[in-house]
């Protein structure tokens, strides 16, 4: 919401459902969700909303220096989803909020930690004024992490090995 009011040209957001109103309540009320024209007509209008993206998320992320990366669930130790890794694979610096012990798994030099700021405005100022050298250092740290042993637990190979060892015994 802060970007909508203050810096509309500095944030693009994508996703499903942001262009639709959702009727809540009884089953009778929820029936209106089936009327696409009505849900689109009543939907809130966001200046920053760019629609849903049908291609590969990593290809889209490559077009941006930064991406807000907010987990759907916060406060669960060790809960790290693909969101931050999509940014890493695109060499887009994540602005992260979610796992409280993220730095036990991923080096702090790889992302901007939203918890270090008092407001979205403060984050925006930090990102806007970041020297290119610092941005490049984030990217170098991301590359180093992706090629380190710390990344192994998050790799496809490790996931397959875990399945093989625990399910297909």
Residue spans of the language-model regions?
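Acidic/glycine-enriched connector segments
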Residues: 18-20
């Amino acid at each position: 919401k802060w970007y909508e009011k203050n810096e509309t040209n500095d944030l693009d957001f994508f996703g499903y459902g942001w262009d639709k109103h959702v009727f809540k309540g009884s089953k009778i009320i929820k029936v209106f969700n089936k009327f696409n024209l009505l849900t689109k007509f009543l939907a809130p209008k966001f200046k920053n909303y760019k629609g849903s993206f049908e291609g590969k998320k990593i290809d889209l992320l490559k077009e941006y220096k930064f991406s807000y990366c907010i987990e759907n669930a916060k406060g669960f130790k060790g809960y790290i989803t693909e969101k931050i890794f999509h940014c890493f694979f695109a060499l887009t610096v994540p602005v992260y909020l979610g796992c409280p012990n993220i730095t036990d798994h991923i080096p702090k030099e790889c992302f901007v930690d939203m918890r270090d700021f008092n407001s979205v405005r403060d984050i925006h100022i930090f990102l806007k004024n970041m020297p290119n050298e610092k941005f490049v250092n984030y990217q170098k740290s991301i590359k180093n992490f992706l090629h380190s042993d710390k990344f192994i637990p998050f790799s496809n190979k490790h996931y397959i090995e875990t399945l093989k060892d625990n399910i297909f015994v």
